[in-house]
């Protein structure tokens, strides 16, 4: 629908409103269009839930999420246009489409905040009920929206020349082009369908290898063939899509970290430890007997954790000079607004500051009163204080470098670290205080993540001429509905990837027993118990115990578990959840004072050395921490992006055009399709259909595919043909055009 009152828009011009002193939105402030409508809110909620599901899966696998605003914008335009044709109604306005992406984008940020923190409770031996996840997500999400409201004018309006908010600007570009020329969602749907089909064939039917690998070996002086290193790639559509979106530079840093881990650290530890006859803590066996996976789990894991922690804190310190100016600017704006009766234009109306104050107060009361959170006054004060600080930081950082590069985990590590140190200083070192620290971290992490997404949405609204108050209401809807779903998704994925491993610890008696909970292994019924602290060599965790509460089996969580093979011989792929592992390591290590500080400091100084070289340490550190199979596939996606960009004009390689191009839209479809099919396969993994066999076991055709199922080379060729080549062709504009 054309808007006659607007100045002509050059579809090829850069619409970042930084060059002129007076900003002119696409929809004038005096123009009233349909915006906050039930249809827009409902569609935003539905699309938000879809992308929240994919974000949960992606964050659990690799500790990363990507912005959902652009694909949601494209889908909204197409869906509303289709509904308009079949119903004979007027097409949706640009402000309604903006409301859809505003409401829908909240799900991705809530998912990131929750997944980065709360699964750490599983590693410390606790259950993670969906009600706790939902409560923390709702409170943290609402805090993120409320605390961002006083900062909107200072950051989005007053600093529009310095804070570009790239994803928000790109989403506005898509909305405006869709308003003028129409946008087809074929590109997103094509990526979604291809990814879902590929994921089903590879991860469900197992027609060919999902994680092909090559092992480097050499002849040792003893005459034995020993491991020298290995490289593997989890050739999945969602990781390929992530690599394309983040680009070759960041994807290359991630892969460099993986190479450092698998080709330097692991071989070095193996070489220096091969002749040792004593166990080197925190390892549980001789280094000579360990393979690459065991060396990584026992040693490199802590080096990577130290590197990620230090890199996150470094990225946070870099933004320190901007924190004070943003905070003081927000209060100054509110002070200037008091005592004046001048009517503000529609495009500058926020929710009243009184509503913000009441909303924050309600969140504080909920944190103290709700049994699912149940924190004390000191903890609530820490949560609100850290949330306000990092909401400001998050908004500024996303304005400078985008939401995908926002160091949310660094802010959360800082929160958990400082909280744990405060608890240690006042003597709060019991198991319950670890839960308290992680709950505070969860609230702050969700608030910071939501604030970053809120900033991008408000930037989009600022460009297209939306009403901030209505956007903020839409965000409250999106945050709340997504939060209620995410807890159930985490439980489902954890259960589907959980393994039961035979373990025995003589003399250890488990005192915490789940009332009414039981499980059966080989026809024998066991009770379910928990150790929340190491006891007699048995680490904190969930166990199956007999009537005397003696341990028989470890229930290894699907999220961040370490034992992929079940007692039945079934092998599952664990969800690494790297950020949650770091949170558990930090809070448990500080409060129990058992951190392997030597390895942690090696990682920390490694990050510092990388920074001194002028390289951003955070993506390299995350690469050290992640399995190389993950970073290698993202790197391949980045390489495809690089190949595409070599054939594009210079002006189309960066900025809004690059962030909303067909390759990015296709990659968004790859991420959503692969992740949602992964969730579906997780359901099949726990659905018993034939005696004691699951649906996933029934559809597995591994035994019938011969060489295709075992050849790493064939798997790589098929990956290139089925995913990499189509992505390159779409990125070049050879199919599935978005405009």
Where are these regions (language model features)?
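Alpha-helical multipass membrane-protein architecture
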Residues: 1-739
